[in-house]
Amino acid sequence: MKSASHLLIFLAAGLSLLHPVNAQNRCSHAPDYFAPLTTGDGQRYPLTIGPLVWHLVGSGMYPVKGSDGLAHLAFAMQFTNSWGLPATIQSVEVVDPAQHNKPTGTNRVISIKDEDVTGLVKLSSLRSSMDKASYSSKIAGGESGVMYFDVTYPNSDDVPCAISLRVHTTQPENKRLPESAVVSPPLKVSSQAAIVLAPPFKGEGWVDANGCCLEIGPHRFVTNPVNGTLDPSEQFAIDWIKIDSQGKAFRTDGKTPEDWLCYGAELLAVAPGTVVEVMRDLPDQTPGAAPENLTIEEFPGNHVTLDLGGGRYAIYAHMAPHTVTVHVGDRVRAGDKLGLLGNSGNTTGPHLHFQISDRPSTLDTTALP
């Protein structure tokens, strides 16, 4: 989360994820899309050579239906120029291998300044900002970066069982291969339905900031290099805050945590589960100031992690000091009190950072819808 003065920049772009997309039945008889170099109908791909290689960031692609009525397939790919000469991406298409690699869905992503960054790579060598200055279609030799996708469909049933990328690249300095068009082997789209949860708090006035999927904001932007891999550890995370009828998040100037409307709110279990991780004694941060000297373990601040079963973990971050009421090993029911909302850890303003993860971590994980 940014400072109080920047808080409402992200509200309009936040997307509530309301309905699960369950492709399990529809895709149960789909071909094995992980078979190398074959299309959905079993034909071999033509062998093509190009300078770029890419792979999925995270453990999978998880479709979900949003409050806009569209089904969203949000994911990220790491691109690397494996050759020594610069290469320029001319176009990137998401295609359906089961339909002879026809384009599928509508892909569009924007920066926090509403700049179109579709088909551009957030380069590792550029400053880490969330505006278009971090992105480019040109990748130097040996350089890498991340490309973000939000592929939307009118209906959940329109989401394919697998996708590939068709990438058209030019490399004028390469006299032997100045141009290439490569279609990657297919990647399965998860058939796992999004989990349906109870709210993590009571009352009115709550809004979801920094939500998925169109805007590459503070959560979707994050791809952490942890334990040798890049993880989209916050791609579906939400910063929950509370505002009044005037759209203000605090009573006066927001300079103290207690001045914020959401501070001290009771946080509730969203589903039955087991407490697997707790931190409770970190101090609150001063709103508007960037925290210093935090260890990696302290980034989520005081927090509770619930094992919901089925490889899903609910994480409540930035809780108030000394307010966590549960302990590791406790069993909780939906609606049970876990503690109070605060401003501890890597935060510049009180809010509840909430996410579902495939592992009990806010860093070494793929966030789930």
Q: What kind of feature is each model-predicted range?
A:
Residues N107-D157:
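Intrinsically disordered, low-complexity Pro/Gly/Ser/Thr-rich segments with frequent PxxP/GP/PP motifs
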Residues V151-I195:
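Terminal connector regions
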Residues S191-A209, G217-F221, R251, L268, ...:
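Acidic, glycine-rich catalytic/binding loops that coordinate metals and/or anionic ligands
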